[in-house]
Amino acid sequence: MRLSNYYIPTLKETSADVSVVSHKYSIRAGLIKQIASGIYTWLPLGLRVLRNIENIVREEMNKSGALEVLMPLIQPASLWKESGRYDDYGSEMLRITDRNQREMLFGPTHEEVITDTLRTTLTSHKNLPITLYQIQWKFRDELRPRYGIMRCREFLMKDAYSFDKDLSGAILSYNLMFKTYIKIFKNLGLTPIAVKAESGPIGGNLSHEFHVLANSGESTLYYDQEIIELMNSDNIDIERIKNTYTAADDMHDPQTCPIPPNNIKTSKGIEIGHIFYLGDKYSKPMNANFCDNNDSKPLQMGCYGIGISRLVAAIIEVFHDNKGITWPEEISPFKFSLVNLYSSNDKCIKVAENLHMQLHNDVLYDDTDDSPGIKLTRTDLLGMPWQIIIGKSTVEQDLIEVRNRSNKDKFLISVEQFLKKFKK
């Protein structure tokens, strides 16, 4: 992709009210544009990151056996009244009335819709267990949206819902999603920490949050250092993870904590996922039942959320330096930045054009007439994992310079050897 044909409205600075790194860099790098408080347009570069995260999430969800659906953003209020949850969200829920004076709402979550779907379409207990998921926009009218896309009002979420016959089956589904979430976050280049959590207005009596450590996090986490090793292990042991002490500030009690104070680690964390065992909280009041040996029983449910748009902010909080973003290769909008420092030099142009053609969709090619300094500053800000620098002195030696954006390593290499090493 040629930068001259692409749209990346970069900025040198942001306003004084932009306080966290991810908010600053997502604006300066042209990922997003604020439209209203807590509401953003995703620009081309940001949308590529969002789609890359979606693809990683979708791949692991599909591997788990979950099936993708798509539910409506606009929901009838009657379903929420039926579940008994209509008033729980208070002012966070945006309520509307259609032309026939029917009460509707913008979905802050989809437990009621998926429960209604299953109660009217599930024909046999032989279809159980089943887990359905979607990747869909949500709206919650946050009182104080802040930190850009980390805490906004409209956000992209992966939400999944499991349905089982009994408690033992529901716990198996819960543990499967627990393990799937660890895989997802590790595939994104993150080390998550799972902590026991309150269920809040979602409900249920078993819940875990997944956090990534970051100084800008809103939660304070208390944990046994062993949890980091368990989360990074190739062999994911769910029971050991569950039994290793971790807690957010609202669940941590120093008086009852089983870990000696000098063994407890304390860090700030950003919540990036949340899983719940719901039991029959929704199925019972909404009569979502299944028949087994002529006996009608409420479905046992679980729900599982990942904030996909929030993950963009969390990843920037973890992967950045004082020059800009340092994207992990797995989700970077492009794998390579190609920078021709001398856009009027025929030999430099020839080498750059050849690399652009060879790398195709994996490269953002800065073919502008801007000065070398501006180009290098911009490519550091945008944060692609590999920078290919085309300069006159190196081209004369039939070499190009390659820089690793993350660890700052750089080396000279011929185009031929580079393509052998890096081209898919």
From Swiss-Prot:
One of its GO terms (molecular function) is proline-tRNA ligase activity. It comes from the Bacteria. One of its GO terms (cellular component) is cytosol. One of its GO terms (biological process) is prolyl-tRNA aminoacylation. It catalyses: tRNA(Pro) + L-proline + ATP = L-prolyl-tRNA(Pro) + AMP + diphosphate. It is an enzyme of class 6 (ligase). The keyword Ligase applies. Its main location: cytoplasm. It is found in: Cytoplasm. InterPro entries: aa-tRNA-synt_IIb (IPR002314), aa-tRNA-synth_II (IPR006195), aa-tRNA-synth_II/BPL/LPL (IPR045864), Anticodon-bd (IPR004154), Anticodon-bd_dom_sf (IPR036621), Pro-tRNA-ligase_IIa (IPR002316), Pro-tRNA-synth_IIa_bac-type (IPR004500), Pro-tRNA_synthetase (IPR050062). It holds the Pfam family tRNA-synt_2b. The keyword Ligase applies. Keywords: Aminoacyl-tRNA synthetase, ATP-binding, Cytoplasm, Ligase, Nucleotide-binding, Protein biosynthesis. Its EC number is 6.1.1.15. Homodimer. Belongs to the class-II aminoacyl-tRNA synthetase family. ProS type 2 subfamily. PANTHER family: MITOCHONDRIAL RIBOSOME PROTEIN L39/PROLYL-TRNA LIGASE FAMILY MEMBER (PTHR42753), PROLINE--TRNA LIGASE (PTHR42753:SF2). Catalyzes the attachment of proline to tRNA(Pro) in a two-step reaction: proline is first activated by ATP to form Pro-AMP and then transferred to the acceptor end of tRNA(Pro). This is Proline--tRNA ligase.
